[in-house]
Amino acid sequence: MATYSTNEFRSGLKIMLDGEPCAILESEFVKPGKGQAFARVRIRKLISGKLLEKTFKSTDSVESADVMDMNLTYLYNDGEFWHFMNNETFEQLAADEKAVGDNAKWLVEQAECILTLWNGQPISVTPPNFVELEITDTDPGLKGDTAGTGGKPATLNTGAVVKVPLFVQIGEVIKVDTRSGEYVSRVK
């Protein structure tokens, strides 16, 4: 398996640390005036989701993680597993609640998602950056009621709650940024 030296660290690189695959979020290579150079790294463990800050000497090397990102289409949820399909081979994969996590509220049938696999098992699911969802419940926006923040909570058809502008009504379809969970626009 490939190894990376500390000067090859960059954001998004997947490495093995303590027997668990991790993704590097930030990497800073430091050359002090006196002493040995080192790399200061922020890491997210892909299975547990924990954030770590770790320092590596410039002479250290780490093993690359044997993880694979695949673009798959979300099919359905059977109550226990979320099912995805590879559009080229039509092979289906099932991800459990631990792999899907909080992203379940952004999964829409037929949406292209990124599944991260480790040893053939899904360890994380990344929904598309933007999804279009229907509003199932929100307070009515009264004309002239613009005092305050100018927003109201709205429940979407997946169960997610998003802050939307006052003019948005029940039954309308809106575009939501899944990375921040914020309203982007109305869909015509």
Curated annotation (Swiss-Prot):
PTM summary: May be beta-lysylated on the epsilon-amino group of Lys-34 by the combined action of EpmA and EpmB, and then hydroxylated on the C5 position of the same residue by EpmC (if this protein is present). Lysylation is critical for the stimulatory effect of EF-P on peptide-bond formation. The lysylation moiety may extend toward the peptidyltransferase center and stabilize the terminal 3-CCA end of the tRNA. Hydroxylation of the C5 position on Lys-34 may allow additional potential stabilizing hydrogen-bond interactions with the P-tRNA.
Subcellular location: Cytoplasm
Metabolic or biological pathway, per its Swiss-Prot or TrEMBL entry: Protein biosynthesis; polypeptide chain elongation
Alphabetical keyword list: Cytoplasm, Elongation factor, Hydroxylation, Protein biosynthesis
Residues bearing the modification N6-(3,6-diaminohexanoyl)-5-hydroxylysine: K34
Matches recorded under NCBIfam families: efp, PRK00529.1
Family: Belongs to the elongation factor P family.
Protein name: Elongation factor P
Organism: Photorhabdus laumondii subsp. laumondii (strain DSM 15139 / CIP 105565 / TT01)
Classification lineage: Bacteria, Pseudomonadati, Pseudomonadota, Gammaproteobacteria, Enterobacterales
